[in-house]
A protein has these predicted regions:
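Short alpha-helical segments that sit at the start of domains
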Residues: 205-223
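Short amphipathic alpha-helical interface segments
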Residues: 155, 217-232
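Conserved small/polar residues in nucleotide/adenosyl-binding loops
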Residues: 233-238
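Flexible glycine-rich surface loops and low-complexity tracts that mediate binding to linear polymers
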Residues: 11-13, 45-56, 77-79, 112-123, ...
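Short aromatic-glycine-enriched beta-strand elements
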Residues: 19-22, 85-88, 160-163
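Short boundary/loop segments of OB/S1/cold-shock single-stranded nucleic-acid-binding domains
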Residues: 1-4, 56-73, 132-145, 177-181
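Beta-strand/loop nucleic-acid-binding surfaces
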Residues: 29-41, 96-107, 171-182
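Long, low-complexity, charged/polar intrinsically disordered regions in eukaryotic proteins
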Residues: 175-210
Length: 241
């Protein structure tokens, strides 16, 4: 059995103790699920979906809490505190996520949020994040066609528009003239491929193109008119008031 640090794993309960449950971690040995995370009614033999990380003493432990992001993800996270070693991000777990100074583009400030990539440090085997997200974006040719639906994470405002991360893998750009509503760093929205350039760069639009866009707009307009007609019909006239 192979476990994945920094990700959700389904593991079997093999032992119950006063301070929690031990899970079968295969070659990694038994992994503690502290008592505060043990679901009510859980018993030996049950399988649980747990997130694996290192505690404050660098021991492999499990939790049934779901973090805001997992290893391999890009996310928009807030700085909880800083010290002489780096910044620590709130990612929904008791132990905050470390960003060493070498992984910061600009010195991170407490209370501010940043787009980061989560990974396991090869040297220390610690979970950490990096604000130097470019190095983690794929340089492969994107497998998209014009009109394909994608999920984007808004990354950075530029003179041309907004840089976005497409499907947690590729870099894309929403041009200013394609914006029909405000975007903000950290937004996750549904979008569409406008163009795949020969160099692999992606142009993104927030609305469907061609006939589908016309059909969608027509449906929205119809619903809007029907809603307004209903309000007009049901609203009291001045004489009734």
């Amino acid at each position: 059995m192979n476990i994945e640090l920094g990700k959700m794993n389904r593991l079997r309960v093999v032992k119950a103790v006063d301070f929690g449950m031990y899970l079968d971690g295969g070659d990694a040995g038994e992994i503690l699920l502290p008592a505060r995370y043990v679901p009510e009614g859980c018993s030996v033999g049950d399988e649980l979906d747990v997130f694996l990380y290192l505690d404050s003493e660098e021991r492999l432990v499990a939790t049934t809490q779901t973090p805001l992001a997992q290893v391999g993800d890009f996310a928009y996270l807030q700085v909880a505190w800083v010290n002489n070693y780096g910044a620590f991000l709130d990612w929904g777990l008791m132990k905050d996520l470390f960003v060493p100074f070498r992984e910061q583009k600009l010195k991170m400030q407490k209370g501010r949020s940043y787009i980061v990539h989560l990974h396991v440090d090869e040297e220390s085997y610690r979970l950490m994040a990096s604000a130097k997200v470019e190095r983690y974006l794929s340089d492969e040719m994107p497998p998209y066609r014009e009109g394909d639906e994608v999920q984007i994470l808004v990354w950075q405002k530029t003179d041309l528009g907004f840089k976005v991360i497409v499907d947690n893998r590729f870099s894309g750009l929403v041009y200013e003239n394609d914006l029909f509503r405000p975007l903000h760093t950290g937004d996750r929205v549904q979008a569409y491929i406008k163009q795949v350039r020969p160099d692999g760069k992606l142009d993104i639009t927030l609305q469907k193109q061609g006939r589908e866009a016309v059909d969608d707009f027509s449906q929205v307009l119809l619903e809007h008119l029907q809603h307004n007609a209903c309000l007009l019909y049901t609203s009291p006239s001045p004489r009734d008031a």
